[in-house]
């Protein structure tokens, strides 16, 4: 029978569609063959579907007829059979029969399904195929036959065994006689047969033993099965044979014992409960008594607390009244309140300061008496002031003779003095009349120079004092003083004492014969030409920028006080208190040496009034006590110091607005800053020497400041970033500050503002010049190397309204004093000075009397760098100046640990950041709002910003950012950690030929000496990047000079007189001793070498170098070890002992530095003993003796 064709769903649908069309067309099976075939196919498919439906229903009916109870019964029988079989026991017959019966029923059911007639042949074949592949289990009848067969088979085997045993037993016992009749082969076979039969018989007789053993094994096997044992635990349990009577006796005995124990325990518990109840009663009575006592105590405490609060409120009210009286400067009311309060501390403070004021009044009389009869008339003062008013008494002692000045001298022709300037002149005339000296401390820009000239003209015209007057000014302000004298007092005969030796020598005859009235000179010539200038008896000695006298041990101060003679002294300064109170005392001591003759007493009265109270801890002053000290100090200073502020005397002066602008670091600055901060040096990549480090970077803070300003200060870094030297965009892209200036300078120039830009480092000024040449912007420059004659030219050019120069580059120290640049209205502080008053002086070059525009100050600070800490320190110093004195903050007795902690705080990156409106990176809109001074400028700046973003190849969403990124740096800088270097680069004096690197000197004394030398020598021109300069303000730079004005001469290292073996052994021994001293730590792991590594700063510890005559530190000793300085071990040991003795001399006995020196000396001596024991020192001494002998022989031969 052929297989019928299989149809898909689509074919069936197409067939039905075709069948419908034929039927609609009227076709029948008789007249259309195609229609007949389609009808047959559809009938066949329909019959197949019905057959399948019938089969499924039949199977469902068959299986649903199974009884569920029967299934449960069969399951129980199967479980029972499993238990028996697991014990190797035969299953019960009823279990087997029930299973077989079930199987027979299933078989019949399946057969009935199979035999179900199928009408469709296709379905029938499919069902047969499906059921034919199944394996039908044997029927129950077959299984029963199989079991019967097995039993009959076992019986047959046993019967055969018994028959065989009977046959073997029936064999004759002796078969030798029969064997004798045979030949040898047959006899041998019979023996074998006999033996085999005997063995077989014995085997068969063991059947009983085998059955017994097999039964035992089958019996023990179930105990080895865990699952069976867990199910049939009871079947494995063996009954324990216990006599019933014995057990009953034991139970009764235990029961009696427990009853007896329970009665005893109950009795004990009852007794204890009685005792506890009694104790609780006692506790209750005690607590009640205590509660009554506590209630009474609380009532007493509440009463006393109420009284104490009332007293405290009264004391606070009185303290506020006293503080208010102090603030209102009502000393009489304050003293009455103090008498009521009976405050012993404040009374003691008043008594101390009053005593000091009395001593000052007496000293004033002594000061006045040196000119003859005292100007102070006690009887007149007593008649004028019948009341004992100490305030009036003290001031009247100083200014007893009063002269009213209403008009300026007639020979003062440069202009008309302002009202406050006339009052200043009157105050100075009062000092002159009362034979006293003073300090004119008006704020910078209020005309101290003009007031001083008015004093000289008044003395010449009114007092008939024709001089001589000595005016000592800084070199930077000498030109300005000369111009002011020519403008305001041209009739005065003056000598400007400056210039080279030949020029000054030409002025000597005029100076000797006193053919002048005023002599203008500088600090340097006061020292240098002391033999000539000190012979003259000066009427008045006037010192401009007198805060230079704050160091009483400086050479200038000692020279003036020791060799120069003058009747009157006047100090001019805009910052009388820059850092602390002793500096102010130094100024007072210079002008009034007989009054302020002891810094110790001044410090005791106003700094530590309670230092000697006997307590161990320092007693801090309260706000009231601090304010009282301030008022008393004002009382001390008022007769001798006059200070006015711009906001108080010049209401018409425009405002001065300062903005701090924080700049981001470029990628190069970030890498260099990280290297310097972590490793203490900068790593560069050199084509010849590979990875190297820049040598000579000792001052870490200074190097960090250089990195913040511009990385190209380090020449090797510039070569690695810009090898050709002609990528000028790198000048502003590598520095955050230069990038910011590249955005703001065009806007300021476009809007017509004139700018003063102040720098701390001339190296940065050199780079700025290169940048300005690149942008083709005209500028002027003034720094410490600018000649005095060029200064006046520069001022004239910049102040000329018709000049096209809108930018003036100045160094803070050289250009921040005595310059009038009122035509500028914008000041940019490129980097802040440690001394904030230097920056204030720089700002006041533009914010001065005569300024008509608002002055904007822009201070550039690198974000998250050491500059933020420097700015915070500067603000702290300004706070001191604002309060004049602050108890406990000006003692100048900071410990070395505190100074070290401060330096560490400068280097720590993770410090708390202050919330500030200008903090963080400024976008262009915020920057425009800061720069703009009106709506018109704001619109202009926005338009310029849009033009820059459109035209510049750098910026956001462009190929390169404005600041150089880390990804643009050479591969060497992109590493997280640079490789260790084996070579160090010494900074060379010159760059790549484009810019001369002039060493920057930060010490004022050295810089002054350098100025002196520069005036005696011609300087060389400073080349730049190759672009010619376009302005007349170019100043010359000189090479590095020594203090005597001669260029430094290079000298090679001295030849080593020791042999290589001797030098190697000496160096090894010295290094071992150095290592033992340098690596010493205390019990807490603190290194002891911390304060011995380098010499202390001369600025922080000036007294150290006065006390210690031979300063030395570990870094110098290590340098000597690596070189050829040490010829013997004793020389190195002597240096170490000198270092230890210096520490013990400068520090008090018992201090940690003193003890560290002792421990390090002990470590050195211990190491020397170890080297002595192992024979190393003996070998070294032998080499030293041999070297000494050879040296003596060589000397004798040369002789």
Swiss-Prot record:
<keyword id="KW-0103">Bromodomain</keyword>
<dbReference type="InterPro" id="IPR049730">
    <property type="entry name" value="SNF2/RAD54-like_C"/>
</dbReference>
<keyword id="KW-0156">Chromatin regulator</keyword>
<dbReference type="InterPro" id="IPR014012">
    <property type="entry name" value="HSA_dom"/>
</dbReference>
<feature type="short sequence motif" description="DEGH box">
    <location>
        <begin position="544"/>
        <end position="547"/>
    </location>
</feature>
<dbReference type="Pfam" id="PF07529">
    <property type="entry name" value="HSA"/>
</dbReference>
<feature type="domain" description="Helicase C-terminal">
    <location>
        <begin position="740"/>
        <end position="903"/>
    </location>
</feature>
<comment type="subunit">
    <text>Component of the RSC complex composed of at least arp9, arp42, rsc1, rsc4, rsc7, rsc9, rsc58, sfh1, snf21, ssr1, ssr2, ssr3 and ssr4. The complex interacts with histone and histone variant components of centromeric chromatin.</text>
</comment>
<dbReference type="Pfam" id="PF00271">
    <property type="entry name" value="Helicase_C"/>
</dbReference>
<dbReference type="InterPro" id="IPR000330">
    <property type="entry name" value="SNF2_N"/>
</dbReference>
<dbReference type="InterPro" id="IPR001487">
    <property type="entry name" value="Bromodomain"/>
</dbReference>
<keyword id="KW-0067">ATP-binding</keyword>
<dbReference type="GO" id="GO:0140463">
    <property type="term" value="F:chromatin-protein adaptor activity"/>
</dbReference>
<dbReference type="GO" id="GO:0140751">
    <property type="term" value="F:histone octamer slider activity"/>
</dbReference>
<dbReference type="Pfam" id="PF00176">
    <property type="entry name" value="SNF2-rel_dom"/>
</dbReference>
<dbReference type="GO" id="GO:0005524">
    <property type="term" value="F:ATP binding"/>
</dbReference>
<feature type="domain" description="HSA">
    <location>
        <begin position="256"/>
        <end position="328"/>
    </location>
</feature>
<dbReference type="Pfam" id="PF14619">
    <property type="entry name" value="SnAC"/>
</dbReference>
<dbReference type="InterPro" id="IPR014001">
    <property type="entry name" value="Helicase_ATP-bd"/>
</dbReference>
<dbReference type="InterPro" id="IPR029295">
    <property type="entry name" value="SnAC"/>
</dbReference>
<keyword id="KW-0347">Helicase</keyword>
<dbReference type="InterPro" id="IPR027417">
    <property type="entry name" value="P-loop_NTPase"/>
</dbReference>
<dbReference type="GO" id="GO:0140750">
    <property type="term" value="F:nucleosome array spacer activity"/>
</dbReference>
<dbReference type="InterPro" id="IPR036427">
    <property type="entry name" value="Bromodomain-like_sf"/>
</dbReference>
<feature type="binding site">
    <location>
        <begin position="442"/>
        <end position="449"/>
    </location>
    <ligand>
        <name>ATP</name>
    </ligand>
</feature>
<dbReference type="GO" id="GO:0004386">
    <property type="term" value="F:helicase activity"/>
</dbReference>
<feature type="domain" description="Helicase ATP-binding">
    <location>
        <begin position="429"/>
        <end position="594"/>
    </location>
</feature>
<feature type="domain" description="Bromo">
    <location>
        <begin position="1061"/>
        <end position="1171"/>
    </location>
</feature>
<dbReference type="InterPro" id="IPR001650">
    <property type="entry name" value="Helicase_C-like"/>
</dbReference>
<dbReference type="GO" id="GO:0007064">
    <property type="term" value="P:mitotic sister chromatid cohesion"/>
</dbReference>
<dbReference type="GO" id="GO:0006338">
    <property type="term" value="P:chromatin remodeling"/>
</dbReference>
<dbReference type="Pfam" id="PF00439">
    <property type="entry name" value="Bromodomain"/>
</dbReference>
<dbReference type="GO" id="GO:0003682">
    <property type="term" value="F:chromatin binding"/>
</dbReference>
<dbReference type="GO" id="GO:0016586">
    <property type="term" value="C:RSC-type complex"/>
</dbReference>
<feature type="region of interest" description="Disordered">
    <location>
        <begin position="1017"/>
        <end position="1059"/>
    </location>
</feature>
<dbReference type="InterPro" id="IPR018359">
    <property type="entry name" value="Bromodomain_CS"/>
</dbReference>
<dbReference type="GO" id="GO:0045815">
    <property type="term" value="P:transcription initiation-coupled chromatin remodeling"/>
</dbReference>
<keyword id="KW-0378">Hydrolase</keyword>
<protein>
    <recommendedName>
        <fullName>Chromatin structure-remodeling complex subunit snf21</fullName>
        <ecNumber>3.6.4.-</ecNumber>
    </recommendedName>
</protein>
<dbReference type="GO" id="GO:0045944">
    <property type="term" value="P:positive regulation of transcription by RNA polymerase II"/>
</dbReference>
<comment type="function">
    <text>Helicase. Component of the chromatin structure remodeling complex (RSC), which is involved in transcription regulation and nucleosome positioning. Controls particularly membrane and organelle development genes.</text>
</comment>
<keyword id="KW-0547">Nucleotide-binding</keyword>
């Amino acid at each position: 029978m052929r297989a019928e064709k299989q149809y898909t769903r689509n074919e069936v649908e197409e067939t039905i569609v075709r069948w419908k069309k034929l039927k609609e067309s009227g076709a029948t099976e008789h007249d259309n063959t195609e229609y007949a075939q389609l009808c047959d196919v559809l009938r066949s498919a329909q019959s197949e579907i019905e057959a399948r439906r019938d089969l499924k229903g039949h199977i469902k009916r068959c299986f649903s007829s199974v009884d569920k109870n029967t299934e449960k019964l069969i399951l129980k029988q199967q479980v029972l059979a499993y238990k028996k079989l697991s014990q190797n026991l035969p299953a019960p017959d009823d279990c087997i029969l029930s299973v077989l019966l079930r199987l027979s029923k299933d078989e019949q059911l399946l057969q009935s399904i199979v035999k179900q007639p199928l009408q469709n042949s296709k379905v029938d074949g499919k069902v047969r195929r499906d059921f034919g592949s199944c394996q039908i289990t044997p029927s129950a009848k077959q299984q029963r036959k199989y079991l019967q067969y097995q039993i009959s088979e076992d019986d047959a085997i046993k019967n055969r065994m018994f028959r065989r045993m009977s046959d073997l037993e029936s064999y004759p016992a002796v078969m030798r006689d029969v064997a004798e009749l045979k030949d040898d082969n047959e006899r041998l076979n019979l023996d074998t047969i006999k033996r085999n039969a005997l063995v077989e018989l014995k085997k068969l007789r063991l059947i009983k033993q085998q059955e017994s053993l097999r039964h035992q094994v089958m019996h023990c096997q179930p105990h080895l099965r865990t699952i069976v044992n867990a199910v049939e635990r009871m079947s494995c349990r063996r009954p324990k044979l216990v006599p019933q009577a014995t057990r009953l006796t034991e139970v009764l005995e235990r029961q009696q014992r427990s009853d007896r124990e329970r009665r005893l325990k109950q009795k004990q518990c009852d007794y204890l409960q009685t005792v506890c109840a009694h104790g609780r009663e006692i506790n209750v009575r005690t607590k009640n008594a205590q509660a009554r006592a506590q209630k009474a105590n609380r009532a007493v405490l509440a009463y006393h607390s109420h009284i104490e609060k009332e007293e405290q409120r009264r004391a606070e009210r009185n303290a506020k009244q006293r503080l208010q009286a102090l603030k209102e400067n009502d000393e009489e009311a304050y003293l009455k309140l103090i008498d009521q309060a009976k405050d012993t501390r404040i009374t003691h403070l008043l008594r101390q300061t009053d005593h000091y004021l009395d001593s000052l009044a007496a000293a004033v009389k002594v000061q006045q008496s040196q000119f003859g009869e005292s100007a102070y008339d006690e009887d007149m003062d007593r008649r004028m002031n019948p009341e004992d008013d100490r305030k009036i008494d003290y001031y009247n002692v100083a200014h007893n003779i009063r002269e009213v000045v209403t008009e300026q001298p007639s020979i003062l022709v440069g202009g008309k003095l302002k009202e406050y300037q006339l009052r200043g002149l009157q105050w100075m005339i009062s000092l002159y009349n009362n034979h006293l000296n003073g300090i004119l401390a008006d704020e910078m820009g209020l005309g101290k120079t003009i007031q001083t000239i008015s004093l000289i003209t008044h003395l010449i015209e009114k007092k008939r004092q024709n001089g001589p007057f000595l005016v000592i000014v800084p070199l930077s302000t000498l030109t300005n003083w000369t111009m002011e004298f020519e403008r305001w007092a041209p009739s005065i005969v003056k000598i400007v004492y400056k210039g080279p030796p030949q020029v000054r020598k030409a002025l000597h005859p005029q100076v000797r014969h006193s053919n002048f009235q005023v002599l203008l000179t500088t600090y340097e010539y006061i020292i240098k030409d002391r033999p000539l200038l000190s012979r003259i008896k000066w009427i008045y000695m006037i010192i401009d920028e007198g805060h230079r006298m704050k160091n009483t041990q400086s050479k200038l101060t000692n020279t003036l006080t020791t060799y120069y003679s003058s009747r009157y002294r006047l100090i001019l300064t805009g910052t009388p208190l820059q850092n602390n109170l002793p500096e102010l005392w130094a100024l007072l001591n210079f002008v009034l040496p007989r009054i302020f003759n002891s810094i110790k007493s001044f410090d005791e009265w106003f700094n530590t009034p309670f230092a000697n109270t006997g307590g161990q801890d320092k007693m801090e002053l309260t706000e009231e006590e601090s304010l009282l000290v301030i008022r008393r100090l004002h009382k001390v200073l008022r007769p001798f110091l006059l200070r006015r502020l711009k906001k108080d005397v010049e209401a018409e002066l425009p405002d001065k607005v300062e903005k701090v602008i924080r700049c981001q670091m470029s990628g190069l600055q970030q890498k260099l800053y990280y290297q310097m901060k972590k490793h203490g040096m900068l790593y560069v990549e050199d084509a010849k020497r590979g990875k190297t480090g820049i040598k000579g970077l000792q001052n870490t803070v200074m190097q960090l400041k250089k990195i913040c300003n511009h990385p190209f200060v380090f020449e090797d870094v510039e070569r690695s970033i810009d090898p050709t030297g002609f990528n000028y965009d790198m000048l502003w892209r590598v520095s955050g500050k230069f990038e910011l200036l590249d955005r703001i300078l065009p806007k300021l120039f476009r809007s017509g503002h004139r700018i003063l830009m102040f720098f701390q480092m001339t190296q940065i000024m050199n780079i700025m010049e290169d940048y300005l040449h690149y942008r083709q912007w005209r500028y002027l420059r003034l720094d410490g190397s600018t000649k005095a004659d060029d200064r006046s030219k520069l001022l004239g050019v910049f102040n000329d309204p018709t000049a096209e120069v809108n930018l003036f580059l100045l160094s803070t120290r050289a250009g921040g004093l005595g310059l009038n640049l009122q035509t500028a209205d914008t000041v940019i502080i490129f980097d802040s000075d440690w001394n904030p008053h230097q920056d204030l002086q720089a700002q006041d070059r533009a914010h001065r009397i005569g300024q008509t525009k608002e002055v904007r100050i822009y201070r550039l600070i690198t974000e998250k760098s050491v500059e933020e800490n420097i700015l915070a320190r500067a603000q702290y110093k300004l706070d001191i100046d604002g309060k004049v004195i602050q108890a406990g903050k000006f003692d100048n007795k900071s410990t070395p640990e505190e100074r070290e902690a401060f330096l560490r705080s400068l280097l720590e990156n993770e410090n708390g950041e202050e919330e500030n409106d200008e903090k963080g990176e400024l976008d262009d809109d915020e920057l425009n709002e800061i720069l703009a001074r009106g709506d018109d400028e704001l619109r202009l700046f926005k338009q310029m910003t849009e033009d820059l973003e459109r035209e510049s190849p750098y910026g956001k969403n462009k190929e390169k950012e404005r600041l150089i990124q880390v990804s643009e740096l050479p591969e060497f800088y992109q590493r997280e950690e640079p490789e260790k270097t084996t070579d160090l680069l010494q900074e060379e004096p010159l760059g790549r030929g484009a810019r001369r690197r002039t060493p920057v000197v930060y010490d004022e004394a050295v810089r002054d000496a350098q100025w002196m030398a520069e005036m005696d020598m011609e300087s060389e021109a400073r080349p730049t990047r190759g672009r010619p300069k376009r302005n007349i303000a170019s100043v010359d730079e000189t090479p590095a000079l020594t203090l005597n004005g001669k260029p430094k001469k290079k000298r090679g290292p001295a030849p080593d007189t020791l042999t290589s073996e001797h030098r190697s052994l000496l160096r090894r021994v010295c290094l071992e001793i150095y290592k033992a001293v340098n690596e010493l730590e205390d019990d807490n792991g603190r290194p002891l070498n911390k304060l011995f590594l380098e010499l202390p700063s001369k600025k922080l510890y000036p007294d150290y170098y006065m006390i210690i005559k031979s300063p030395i530190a570990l870094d110098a000793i290590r340098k000597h070890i690596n070189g050829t300085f040490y010829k013997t071990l004793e020389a190195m040991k002597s240096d170490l002992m000198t270092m230890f003795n210096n520490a013990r001399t400068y520090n008090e006995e018992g201090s940690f530095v003193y003890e560290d020196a002792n421990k390090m000396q002990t470590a050195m001596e211990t190491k020397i003993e170890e080297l002595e024991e192992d024979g190393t020192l003996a070998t070294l001494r032998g080499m030293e003796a041999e070297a000494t002998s050879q040296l003596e022989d060589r000397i004798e031969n040369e002789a």
